[in-house]
């Protein structure tokens, strides 16, 4: 008898970005610029830090299993009823919970090839069938192709807007015909981890769409613009029936006490959010222009990162060369982009350091 089912034995574990401490140990460098994991270059809100410190005095107690205060803070911030809010140990957990809760054996999960790998992992972890539509022009969601793959077996659809790792996005005019074609008992999950960085015309977030399409679920995170990646905290918005079923399946204390306090406080610091957004809107074009000057094909992005393709080069080699320079980027060969790097938008000095290092590497 095998130790694990075939669908588990065939899994390839997710490989996160290298930690700063590991790079310092391996390469003997200091002051490493981590531009690999799309974290907030400004760090967390001071209000969130203060709330976290205060909450640390209570860590001998279990957290509120319902995350009542956090759920209500999210609801108040977004103008939705609290019963439409669910929280998770990162939005990744909510992706897994949605698959576990709603997709039966023989039903399908539909998404775009080369989009966020967590959708594929969640389907495979639970032994569910994954159906992928090819991207359009290498880097863009093809909603027409996705629509043609809809079937009576489609139970969940995952759409990242903006996408990770490409940074591309789709407009309301592109999305609405797709939503009109989706069966009402199929859930469409709009993953909006980077929505706060969007400034593109024609973009429509999922909050308004939920009013017209009750089968839409919106996922967001505290890891990006709120700067709480280490806390592992995300949330979802869905009709109450969906939230209730997810609550039945999730672990009883899936978000910790400190994270709940920090998340609620972060929501109240609109100045820090505005500052974080302004940094990205200023530095994103600076980084993109610098990469293009080095010969990269830079994919227009609405996230806090850019995807840069270096034809004739290998992303893995560039990644390792950057590590020796004290810069951590993200190779994306696993997404089907073997000559590309995904680079987080950092502080100006970090972006300049990355560009200078790449200039030396490419010119060698």
UniProtKB/Swiss-Prot annotation:
Belongs to the class-II pyridoxal-phosphate-dependent aminotransferase family. Histidinol-phosphate aminotransferase subfamily. Its cofactor is pyridoxal 5'-phosphate. One of its GO terms (molecular function) is histidinol-phosphate transaminase activity. This is Histidinol-phosphate aminotransferase. Transmembrane segments: none annotated. Gene3D superfamilies: Aspartate Aminotransferase, domain 1 (3.90.1150.10), Type I PLP-dependent aspartate aminotransferase-like (Major domain) (3.40.640.10). One of its GO terms (biological process) is L-histidine biosynthetic process. Pfam families: Aminotran_1_2. Pathway: Amino-acid biosynthesis; L-histidine biosynthesis; L-histidine from 5-phospho-alpha-D-ribose 1-diphosphate: step 7/9. InterPro entries: Aminotransferase_I/II_large, HisP_aminotrans, HistidinolP_aminotransfase, PyrdxlP-dep_Trfase, PyrdxlP-dep_Trfase_major, PyrdxlP-dep_Trfase_small. Homodimer. The modification N6-(pyridoxal phosphate)lysine is found at residue 224. HAMAP family: HisC_aminotrans_2 (MF_01023). Keywords: Amino-acid biosynthesis, Aminotransferase, Histidine biosynthesis, Pyridoxal phosphate, Transferase. It catalyses: L-histidinol phosphate + 2-oxoglutarate = 3-(imidazol-4-yl)-2-oxopropyl phosphate + L-glutamate.
